[in-house]
Amino acid sequence: MADKDAQDFLKFLKSNASTDEKTRCLDTLRSFFNKNNIPNADLGLFVECFRLALTTVNPLLLRSSVACFETFLRRLRAQYPTWLKFRVPMLKNLVIDHIASRDLQKRVLNILIDLWHFNPSEIEKSLIHLSTTSKSAETRIQCFKWFVLAHNAHLSFDVKSLRPALYINLENANPSVREEAKEVLLLIYKNLSTSAKMQFITDVETTSGLRREILQSLVEELSLISSSSEVIIVQNSASSFQPAPFMTAVATLYPGVELENVKPLLANFSKQLEQDSASMLPAFEGRETEQNWSVRQDSVLRLRQYLRGNACIDYLPELLSVLKTLLPGILLALLSLRTTLSSSAIQLIKEMAIILKSNIDPFLELILPNLLKVCSVTKKLASQAANVTFAAILVNCGVLSRNLSFISLAAHDTNAQLRVFSSNWIFMLISLSPELKNLASLQTNLKAFEKLICRGLADSNSQVREVYRKSFWKLSEYFPSVQEELTNTLEPSVLKQLHLANPNRQAASFNFSGPKRAPIRPLSNLRSFSKSQKEETSSNSSNSSGTRRLGLPQRATPASRERVLPYTRSQAFHSTSLPPSLPSGHSPSIAIPSKRSVSATIKDESKTFELLKNIQRKYELILSGSSVDLPSAEFLSSNLTDALYSGSSICYSLIFSHSLLDLTFQYVDIASLLSQFLLCVYDPSNVGHSFALASFPYVKSHYDAHKYFPIVFDVLMNISNMAPHVKVFPFNTNQKRLIIHGCLLWLKEISDTKLNQLENKPFFVTDKLRYYSSKILAMTAKTKLTSKNWIPLSGLLFSLRAHDTFMFDGLLDRLNEESRTKLVSSWSKQDAFDYSKSSTHQEHLSKNLPTLNTSSSSNSSQTDLLVPHGKGETKETEMQSPIESKEGLLSKDTHIESPQGTSLEKENEEEGKNPVESNCSEESLDDHNIDQTLVNKKETLAQDSESLLQKNNALNEKGFENQFGLSSSAAKVLNKDTLDHVSGPISNSVSSSFKDFTRTPFKEINGERETGFELTSYVNALSKKDDINVQKTENVDESVGLNAMFMDNVNQDSLNSVDQSSGKDKLLLTSSTPNKPTTFFMPANEEILGSPAKDYDIHDQSYSVHELHSENMRENVGQSSLIYNNRDYMNTPMNDFSLSFSEIKGGILESPVESPMTGTISPIDADESVLHDIPAYESLNKSESNKYQEQAYSTPLHHTLNVLPKNKWILSRMHKMENGSPINVDKNLDDAVAALEAAVKELNDGSVNTKTLKFCIKVCKETPSMLYHSHGLLPAILHYIESNNSAMHISDCLILLHEFLVQGYQGVDMHTYHNIICILIEKAEKCKDEPVILAGIEDNITLIAEIADLQGLYEFTQQRLQSLNTETGEKSAPLLLMLLSAILMRLKDLEFLETKDLLRHVVLKYIDHTNPEIRKATFNVCLAVNTIVNNVDETFSILGGLNEGQRLLFMHYLKMKSDEKN
């Protein structure tokens, strides 16, 4: 159609032609649109024609006009989509007025749907506006019908903008409008999940203001609840946690145990619980005030309502998580002085126990101690409520054995009220055993009940005694044997009152005359009672010195009724006498260690930490020659003792450093020091385990072995309660077992490796050896074969026997038959030989040896360890003569195990057991049969030992000198020491009465090759101070290193990391040199703890033995890597370790974004806007831009960096932004370019939306070549980030910046990278409380460190760090340090001198900074340096100036990062 025809048609429509003619003309035009294209010049004329035709009121002409207009739009959509996109508002207005017409409404709705594809927001806004402002009900209805059509056509319109219009029309006066609006709401939300539906209902309740009837109708239609009402849900949910049947019986004893009436509260969705808990947390922070106590009470009440609702059924995991988060606040409310708040918290805990039952078992460790505190208060209301709650917990949740431990604490408390409550709890547990169905558990813990009842029957409070009498008879009903056992141990007065309280006692007869008298007891009872009184008298007379038997401290029963005074502080902690050669500057402390709980205040721990740092600094200055005075001896004694028992990991990192250990040896009682130190070494769950383990070699080298032997022996005797004057130690039974384990291993180590060299020393005399052996032999009677301490004990005795066999056999003959058989049988199974005693020397020694017993008391009721010789002597067992060597080591079949996990701690949880004992039954051992194969094996080992000895002798001085480059004098020393260590046991074995080869922990034989290795001491590897210290270390025999065993041209690939003899995992330490690879073995945890001070090294740096003698040999030490095959190496919980004191106890709330920049932020004096004048962003000029961008964007990049965000939230958001239909550049290039330019404009104007950012990200991701057509995208992104504060859009812009840099990094120069970093740092300072923005900033800075030019970026970072002032900003320093660590990860070596200078400057400046973020970033820099050099010692030398505490912290941080990777 020509231009003239379009003009003629317009004139025809304006003329007065008839309607039929106009209709025919429109039909002809419609047919033309279906078959032909529309000329571009005629578009405006046709639009004007339709504007005129659609304004008519004639229905026939209007219907033809709408039909022709629909065809016209269909042709435009195919021919001119771009033209149509920008004319949607004009075309929409032509037909939207006819939406209410019955004949035209269907076509009009279809036209609007066609226009929606080109401009969705315009169509939606117009319809929403029309639905709320139109006075025509039909118009509103048709607007809603359009949304129904759009929903059925799966068009993603904006529901959030539509909801307010629907809420308004739900209140419309026209019922048809209300129904249509309701239908749209139901259509949108009926297919969603229940949680989404409940979220919608919650929003309607809070924002819409609808009437209750309308809201109830919506809820019913969405099928959320039944039509009856929501009360049905509450009743059904409440019925599911009705109290158990036995609660009725409990209610008879405790009337207040029933649940109170509380209005239930429904949880609509899981997020509701988390949102409510987040709003409750601020109320429980800080101290209780007049303003927040009511808020706390409301929070507690709301939790009780949730428990009564559906949360415990539908959202149990979320509810438990909320309760765990709020548990500290609930306990604060429990201990409140306000009775109202405290009672509410008590009721909450009671309802938790009744409703949640065993689900709250993990919380009981915190709840029960605090409940005991409330039970002991004088407020009757609070104490009685706590009493009832404790009873409810006992019958509903928790393990009986663990609950009994808390009841035992209450029963032994000085508060009479608490003892009365505990007696009632015991009676309840016993009497309700059938209802609780725990008779089996009751029988398992029968001993604990018997102890509590025996103590309660003699309690000073009459109420307590009365209840325990009832408990006694109730327990006797279920276990009749208990009555006979307990009555034999009770006093007559107690038995008399107990008999009177017997419920089954027959009533006395009154039909007799005469005075009343007590019943006549049988003669047998009288005899047994007289005998027990004699034994008790003799026991009291012999035990007057306070000696106690093996086991826990027991209350001695005095012979008279006089009151026994407790130990005084000085008597209870009697100091061990030190050898005369020990330092005598100050006498050791005799103060009792502070028994502070782990829950000590943060302020006190921080004060202790700072105090230790000051003491360490002063002591190091004194060592360096400065004139500084230490505090007084009393001050050092008390504070070092408190720090030793503080239980804080940060304090242990200092107290177990070498300098403070020296002070601790001088000012703290050595028994207290060694007992606590051994506990830390052998308890992997202790927070000081890793630090004590690292310092163990240094502690061993502090004194000579012959001086340590009596000290460790005294600790062993005191811990096992076998000393004449027992000291009081603040340890429980399990801890004492661990200390005993460590003492036995240490004594055996000294006996095996050191005492052979002391035959001419004053220590090595027969009398002392006899004394030590007799005392240790006494421990065999109370140590069971299945105990973890049995193998170390038997190994120690076997080692002591090797020094003087004649004397030891005499002691062994005096031992009772049972203990002697058990010990000898254990030796035979361990070392594969029979043992027989000789009657010739038995008679000789029996006259001179003292009588040996397991305790100092002479109680005749106990079995003596030594069997008296004479007529009553039993027939001796015939055994062969022992074949042995002086080494006397245990065979490899009996490798002494060190503590692994908490196996030692789990042997016996009862406090009443001896720490040397085990609860397991003894094994029956057979020590009379010898397998012939073991004898053959012995001969084979003897032959191997001879061949190995010949090879070792072949290593002469010249060989050492040639192989290791040592001087002749050094070779002599080394050759002598090495051969002593290597061939000493072998030569002794060969020269002894039999040729038996004993295994050492650091030996492995592969085929015919003998391999050895040497690991230096951790003390020397961690801190090599100067030549004086090295020389001093050489002079000390104990700290020279391990047994020097060198490899003899062995292929190291054949070495295994598992000890073939014991099956224990080893830590493999590999060191490679250019000429000859060398592989060393790192001993596992059990061998580290059981070996001498010189026999192991836990440092991850490998050294050769000649490094101790020549500094020049350090060059041959290559890079090493440590493979952690043993998880028990440094088994410190991560939550117990931190880089500073503020990070130990400071609670950091977890944010949705895991960003190292988030968390607790230290307060600052002034905000920092910029570091200095940040240069404005300068874009490239046109020529430079064309040069770079033509190179980068002329064709799609085939090489895309694989750099993904490390933050999970950002990565998820990026994937969500990338979803959608791909961009088709071939067909819509002009449109895409226009859209990209529009996006740049929106970014510059600050009016960008999510859809625009999503489009830009897809452009960068899918079609990077389009970036060539837009020169201002990067400046626009940076401008928007710098000038806007919308968190969501800023985070999306940071994602866009990430994608732009990944795809277009080749076109960005270094100056632009500098500007980007400056803008990001400035933004981080402004948005330091926005974790999402901080995570995006960190991601982009890390990306820039990966893609930018390394030299230019390093120079920029160096300049910024040197001019940085951390006092005016909080985020600048962490970000720059993070950038520096990322730059270092790209380096292969630190070849520039200025690099090392910068690292020293940065680390020394920020490693002790008050801001935890800066400290963590500094340790990451240290970690990056260690990754480059792959050598911890070289890392310390590069950083320089780090003290021992900082080095230990870095070692622990390195281990923590290694565990995270694994």
UniProtKB/Swiss-Prot annotation:
Descriptive protein name: Protein peg1
Sorted alphabetically, which Gene3D superfamilies does this protein's record hold?
Answer: Leucine-rich Repeat Variant (1.25.10.10)
Family annotation (SMART domains)? TOG (SM01349)
What's the source species for this entry?
A: Schizosaccharomyces pombe (strain 972 / ATCC 24843)
Point to the regions of Basic and acidic residues compositional bias.
870-896
Q: What is its main location?
A: cytoplasm
Any one cellular-component term (Gene Ontology): nuclear envelope
Low complexity bias (residue ranges):
538-552, 574-589, 847-866
What task does this protein carry out?
Microtubule binding protein that regulates the stability of dynamic microtubules. Required for mitotic spindle formation.
What GO molecular function annotation could you give as one example from this UniProt entry? microtubule binding
The UniProt annotation puts the region (Disordered) at: 528-563, 573-592, 838-928
Residues annotated as transmembrane: none
Q: Which residues carry this modification: Phosphoserine?
A: S599, S1221
Cystine bridges: none
